[in-house]
Regions:
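C-terminal cap of thioredoxin/glutaredoxin-like
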Residues: 3, 11, 17-29, 103-209
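Structural alpha/beta surface segment adjacent to cysteine/selenocysteine redox centers
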Residues: 10, 14-111, 194-209
Length: 209
C-alpha cells in the first residue's frame, strides 16, 4: 500500500473541490486525512493568505465559482470569509472519517454554514449527523492532534492547502490532483533530471524585504 497524507483546511474552497475527487484514488492508496490551520502555515512561512489581498480575494472566489461549475459541483460562497475554522477543523479531527469530513465541507461550501457563529456551527453538526460537537472539539487530545497536524505539515514542507504528501513528495493545490494520480501510476516521474532540477534552481535576483 502507498501511504498518502492529505492536508486540508475547510476554509479553502479548493480543498472542498479536491475532497470531491478523493474517490478517484486507486485502491492501493492508504489515505490519512489531516486537518490543519491554514493560518498556521501562513505564519510559519511568512505569507499572506489569498483572502488578505483584496483583488486576489475577489479573483480567488470568482475562480472557485467557475471551477466548481466546470466540475459539476454544487457550490455557494459562505456569508463570511475569512471565517474562523477552528471548531470545524477540530470536529474533523474528532470524527476521523472521510465521509463525515466531506459532509462538513458541504455544510460550509454548499449550505453556507460557517463554524464561527452558533447557527452555522449547529448546521455543520447537523450535516455531520451529531449533536455533541461542543464536547468533541473541547477534548484536549483533539486540540493537540490539530496542532500536531500543523507541525507535521510544516516539517514536511507543506505551505498551502490542500496538499498531498506521498513518499516525501509535495503536491499542492486542487489543480495538482491529476499530478497525484500520475505519480501514483508512475513514481519515477519525480526522479527525472528536470524534476530534480526544480529543487536546485538558483536565483539570480531577489527582492528586498
Amino acid at each position: 500500500m502507498t501511504q498518502a497524507t492529505w492536508y486540508f483546511d475547510v476554509i479553502s474552497p479548493f480543498a472542498y473541490m479536491q475532497a470531491s475527487r478523493l474517490a478517484e484514488l486507486p485502491d492501493t492508496v492508504e489515505l490519512a486525512c489531516r486537518p490543519l490551520l491554514f493560518a498556521g502555515l501562513l505564519g510559519h512561512w511568512g505569507q499572506l493568505g489569498p483572502a488578505e489581498i483584496a483583488p486576489k480575494k475577489t479573483f480567488t472566489f470568482q475562480h472557485s465559482i467557475w471551477r466548481a461549475r466546470r466540475m459539476g459541483l454544487d457550490f455557494n460562497l459562505p456569508p463570511n470569509h475569512p471565517f474562523n475554522p477552528i471548531r470545524a477543523l477540530r470536529l474533523c479531527v474528532a470524527l476521523d472519517d472521510l465521509a463525515a469530513i466531506q459532509s462538513v465541507f458541504r455544510a460550509i461550501w454548499v449550505d453556507g454554514h460557517v463554524p464561527d457563529n452558533d447557527a452555522g456551527w449547529a448546521g455543520i453538526q447537523a450535516a455531520a449527523g451529531i449533536d455533541d460537537g461542543d464536547a468533541r472539539v473541547a477534548d484536549p487530545a483533539v486540540k493537540q492532534a490539530l496542532i500536531a497536524n500543523g507541525e507535521a505539515a510544516t516539517a514536511a514542507g507543506v505551505f498551502g492547502v490542500p496538499t498531498f504528501v506521498i513518499d516525501g513528495e509535495i503536491f499542492w493545490g486542487d489543480d495538482a490532483f491529476d499530478m497525484v494520480l500520475d505519480y501514483l501510476a508512475d513514481p519515477a516521474m519525480m526522479a527525472t533530471d528536470a524534476m530534480k532540477g526544480a529543487a536546485t534552481l538558483v536565483p539570480s535576483s531577489e527582492r528586498k524585504r
